[in-house]
Amino acid sequence: MELKRLSISWQFLIVLVLILQSLSALDFDPYRVLGVSRTASQADIKKAYKKLAREWHPDKNKDPGAEDKFIQISKAYEILSNEEKRTNYDHYGDAGENQGYQQQREYRFRHFHENFYFDESFFHFPFNSERRDSIDEKYLLHFSHYVNEVVPDSFKKPYLIKITSDWCFSCIHIEPIWKEVVQELEGLGVGIGVVHAGYERRLAHHLGAHSTPSILGIINGKISFFHNAVVHENLRQFVESLLPGNLVEKVTNKNYVRFLSGWQQENKPHALLFGQTPAAPLLYKLTAFAYKDYVSFGYVYVGLRGVEEMTRQYNVNIYAPTMLIFKEHINKPADAIQARGLKKQVIEDFITQNKYLLASRLTSQKLFHELCPVKRSHRQRKYCVVLLTAEANKLSKPFDAFLSFALANTQDTVRFVHVYSSRQQEFASTLLPDIEAFQGKSGVSILERRNTAGRVVFKTLEDPWTGSESDKFVLLGYLDQLRKDPAFLSSEAVLPDLTDELAPVFLLRWLYSVSDYLSDFWESLLHSNWREMMPLLSLIFSALFILFGTVIVQAFSDSNEERESHPPDKEEVPEKAGKTEPSFTKESSSKIPKKGFVEVTELTDVTYTSNLVRLRPGHMNVVLILSNSTKTSLLQKFALEVYTFTGSSSLHFSFLTLDKHREWLEYLLEFAQDAAPIPNQYDKHFMERDYTGYVLALNGHKKYFCLFKPLKTVDEETVGSCDLDSSRGKPPCGLGPKPLKGKLSKLSLWMERLLEGSLQRFYIPSWPELD
């Protein structure tokens, strides 16, 4: 009886769970969210998703519920666009990312938990990101927001970004620490962001985050991952490590004069913070990064020996943080603040009010736009008093007088600037009426910009500026008239753009780029996972495989060439009846170069295709014509003549036996204009024509050849007459080695002309067969 009751109770519980599961499934229906039917095609689903995504995107729709609606739309499309997930949802009602029976049971239990316990905070497991009350929701990032706002803003302040997702126990574990760090760092000026990997997969993949939780920093558009334990101090040190190391200079009594005098070269005010800690505070470093283009920052540790001289000179209270701003005068600060706890807003307001020198030098068009903005209305007029001076007069009396005048007449509507005439010649010549009258002297102009295209109205003092009291009186009178009548600026011109004087040269920019690339590579090599490193490793191993493969093939090729280069012990020399071949002495044989010096192959029907017909483009085969009787002597001379040209990999060397392939040679010579008198085949001396010593340079790809024809000597003509007598039955005359070697005496000069491309080329329609 008890077993029966227990069985009924279990059945009732299972039915109750299934009913609750069915009810919970109604909470989220991807078909209902996208407004499509269950039989909709992928094209219809995609079309509906694009329409709803454009309508409910948080960047375009300002409705308070737009973000939640957009998340539901993305989640619905993620399920229905994947056939496997769509089938799983249709069969089991699984609307999440988990698949399979085990995941399905977990999903059903989760929805049962959410419907049975109405307050999920009872168990303190905030798995559902749509319902949890977390600090992350305030900092959620979308891809467009990241690209259009976070990346450009990272050039002014670093960003700390966390990658999270649903069902992430580690994310829950680090949330208290994350909340504490965010509250501190955001107050110091660090940007905060959170990316939900489930809904912003594109952004998570773009950031290179393949696991959750992940924490990364972004500065100057560069991404750096956090790899230490998630504790407060480590995260603070990570943010500090993102900042460049040269933002704040350590200043002591030995180098403070040099530091403050840097305004002349850097064209910036210089800030000094006197603090009681050995290192500069993080707030000060973040401020230095935000205003690095406008102010140079230094830090003085008041506990260092010898600093008393500085604190006494500038009247600094060493028991409270003190910040001083120096401009053109290094003996007295232009402004100062002192407080027990310097806040971010106080420091930013202080720096903003002192971003520029009293009389800044116009070094770029960007600075010109900031100091002399375009007039927007009659109440927002901005005038610029420009001192056009030579660079050598920077510290002279006229410049000092201009500074003192600027200090005494500082107004919201008037800016004082100066320009080096030698560096901005076009700009100076436009404002000065008579450039020759102001040669080597200073001039002062008052101008007002009318538009961004460079149109200005101006008035230039007639006489050069010497800094005298009369000059100051005249300039003050001009400003008084301008205050009463804006039309006082009677001249009009279009100013050319200023040259950027402080821009780094190309070599420095290239070195900076290489340095950044190497640092990024080293960072990824140390900390990236295998998924990120696989393409790089594949490229490296492929390059190494090709390199070593080429070396091994070349080594085997060289060994084969050396093996084939050993000459045979004896050279077969055919003998003719009634003729005695000349014997080589040891002295003459020692002059024969080793076969390894010049590799000469015989051109036969076997090697004809590879050595000529299918020769690679740009390669040529230099062929020596010889007979069986002249083979040894001509090859010896040929090797000596072409030895200096064997360094070229595009030249190949061969020899052709005249006794075997006379017809092939006669066919080629027919295309050579006056290269040699071609005998008629009915001539009785047709087969007696001597072509030994001829050399042909054959270009197999372009189908042309160049011809070397040896010059006949007196000895050769005598030998020729002997050959005629031999044909009549008389004994032939002997042909010594000297006349044969003389045939190729001019070959080296011919080879030089061949490489120069100055030889005559004889083209043929196609290469004949070599029988």
From Swiss-Prot:
Signal peptide range in chain numbering: 1-25
Q: What's any GO biological process attached to this entry?
A: regulation of autophagosome size
Which Pfam family, an example, fits this chain?
Answer: Thioredoxin
Give the transmembrane ranges. Answer: 533-553
- List the biased-composition ranges (Basic and acidic residues): 560-579
Residue ranges that the UniProt entry lists as topological domain Extracellular: 554-771
Annotated region (Disordered), positions in chain: 559-590
Which coarse location class applies to the principal site listed for this UniProt protein? endoplasmic reticulum
Cytoplasmic topology ranges: 26-532
Q: Where is the J domain?
A: 29-93
Top-level taxon:
Eukaryota
Query: What keywords are assigned to this protein?
Result: Autophagy, Endoplasmic reticulum, Glycoprotein, Membrane, Signal, Transmembrane, Transmembrane helix
GO cellular component terms, A-Z? endoplasmic reticulum membrane
Record bears the keyword Membrane: yes
Subcellular location field: Endoplasmic reticulum membrane
Q: Which Gene3D superfamilies match?
A: DnaJ domain, Glutaredoxin
- Domain Thioredoxin, which positions? 116-244
PANTHER family hit by this protein? DNAJ HOMOLOG SUBFAMILY C MEMBER 16
Q: What does this protein do?
A: Plays an important role in regulating the size of autophagosomes during the formation process.
Name of the molecule in the record: DnaJ homolog subfamily C member 16
Q: What is the lineage of its organism?
A: Eukaryota, Metazoa, Chordata, Craniata, Vertebrata
